[in-house]
């Protein structure tokens, strides 16, 4: 395993730069503790890139990302750029082209309820008390969002609209492998979500996932219909480890998983291609209303750095160290404003420094 890596850092807009500053602290602590050589280069993206370069994804940014082992992404967008045509706005003009350029076909969204944060979980107390730690693995480039034909035709009462759910065998195979490999780093359980009692695309999905599962005899596999899965997530989320989903089902379930954790400020996200190259970002937005106030929760950005170390750089030990430090900081009662309730809140900068210190101390 190489110990020399280069990361393209794209802080973006809103709270992006201030939470990214905390991720830098974490990477520095990881360098020192694990003797890993990690270098970084920073590039403009989103609204700030529009202001400086005239577009949300400059060619220099793309070229810099091509030279890196992974991308650590902040957040983009804000009211300042909402007057632009939709295709030119930061969100659509930056993230979607990056995903397409680097062929990022899989999205990984962890959702964990940390001890001490049960009060923020909207589920019943006895359910929240059990906790949960779920990884939603979503296929990003196939399915009904991209299938052809799609469109509208006709007039009057005969006007109709249509979309087409299409999945190729190779698309299902590669996302299934991501799910099973991820399960091996966790609790060795995959729940594949489909609607095989109605949809032909789901029949193929279930067949292919069942075939791929044979190569992972150490991983438990079970299948669940999407309607039942949405119910089971509310009834008992602790039953899930890795949830394997098509594009549209993953879109729905990953947001449901996010909501039951109680705070978007805790949720990282990873988008990967077949070579392990990935873009890592917080699941929340740029939060321009709190930008510059020093109150943003940096944990999602910090945990995104942990995912980067695990999935693109192959350093699961370093990723675990970050996650353990985050958990310990929360156990010790450290909270940013979004999680403080009636208690005392610490700043964005203080939270980053606290977690970095715990990494250095090896908690």
UniProtKB/Swiss-Prot annotation:
Annotated binding of NAD(+), by residue: 78-91, 285-297
Pathway linked to the protein: Amino-acid biosynthesis; L-leucine biosynthesis; L-leucine from 3-methyl-2-oxobutanoate: step 3/4
Residues the record lists as binding substrate: 99, 109, 138, 227
GO cellular component, one term: cytosol
Subcellular location(s) of the protein: Cytoplasm
Main location class: cytoplasm
UniProt catalytic activity: (2R,3S)-3-isopropylmalate + NAD(+) = 4-methyl-2-oxopentanoate + CO2 + NADH
Cofactor stoichiometry and binding remark: Binds 1 Mg(2+) or Mn(2+) ion per subunit.
Cross-referenced SMART domains: Iso_dh
Gene Ontology MF terms: 3-isopropylmalate dehydrogenase activity; magnesium ion binding; NAD binding
Keywords noted in UniProt: Amino-acid biosynthesis, Branched-chain amino acid biosynthesis, Cytoplasm, Leucine biosynthesis, Magnesium, Manganese, Metal-binding, NAD, Oxidoreductase
Cofactor requirement: Mg(2+); Mn(2+)
Pfam short name (any one): Iso_dh
NCBIfam families: leuB
Quaternary structure (record): Homodimer.
PANTHER family: 3-ISOPROPYLMALATE DEHYDROGENASE
Protein name (record): 3-isopropylmalate dehydrogenase
Organism for this UniProt entry: Photorhabdus laumondii subsp. laumondii (strain DSM 15139 / CIP 105565 / TT01) (Photorhabdus luminescens subsp. laumondii)
Protein encoded by which gene: leuB
